[in-house]
């Protein structure tokens, strides 16, 4: 344990908080070709690869994912939520933060019902999370 004098000479360092979704905290000025510190809640990108991957140990499934090149030129892996999707290579998608616990390296979600991504069909409950319109009564 340090003495008061040691703390006066060299105070304690505060912990640096690390972002859960770092690609959303970087902007890009295409005019000057420089990265900026412009944070955003969502970002637009182009899907460069769409596929499935298997989750970590206790779970078993084929989870859908897309490799996305964002508007700030960073490439990330994003999860495609819901049952069924219409994404393919060169689809324009909107991503938000939020990791998938059993997929290593997947820190982003694709927003359903935005840009080229269609909402989940035949969904009755929790529709807003999956971009589904209200069914006709």
From Swiss-Prot:
Gene that encodes the chain: rpsL
Annotated segments matching region Disordered: 1-21, 34-57
Protein name according to UniProt: Small ribosomal subunit protein uS12
Keywords on record: Ribonucleoprotein, Ribosomal protein, RNA-binding, rRNA-binding, tRNA-binding
GO cellular component: small ribosomal subunit
BP GO terms, sorted: translation
Free-text function comment from the UniProt entry: With S4 and S5 plays an important role in translational accuracy.
Database matches in Pfam families: Ribosom_S12_S23
Disulfide bonds: none
Origin species: Streptococcus mutans serotype c (strain ATCC 700610 / UA159)
GO terms for MF: rRNA binding; structural constituent of ribosome; tRNA binding
Family classification: Belongs to the universal ribosomal protein uS12 family.
Subunit structure: Part of the 30S ribosomal subunit. Contacts proteins S8 and S17. May interact with IF1 in the 30S initiation complex.
CDD domains the record matches: Ribosomal_S12
Superkingdom, natural source: Bacteria
């Amino acid at each position: 344990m340090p003495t008061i004098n040691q703390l006066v000479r060299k105070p304690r360092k505060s912990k640096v908080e690390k972002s859960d979704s770092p690609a959303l905290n970087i902007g890009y000025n295409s005019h000057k070709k420089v990265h900026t510190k412009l944070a955003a809640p969502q970002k637009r990108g182009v899907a460069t690869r769409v596929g499935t991957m298997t989750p970590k140990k206790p779970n078993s499934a084929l989870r859908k994912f897309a490799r996305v090149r964002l508007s700030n030129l960073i490439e990330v892996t994003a999860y495609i939520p819901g049952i069924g999707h219409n994404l393919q290579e060169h689809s324009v998608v909107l991503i938000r933060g939020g990791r998938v616990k059993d997929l290593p390296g997947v820190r982003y979600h694709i927003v359903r019902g935005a840009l080229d991504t269609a909402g989940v069909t035949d969904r009755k409950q929790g529709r807003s999370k999956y971009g589904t319109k209200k069914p006709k009564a």
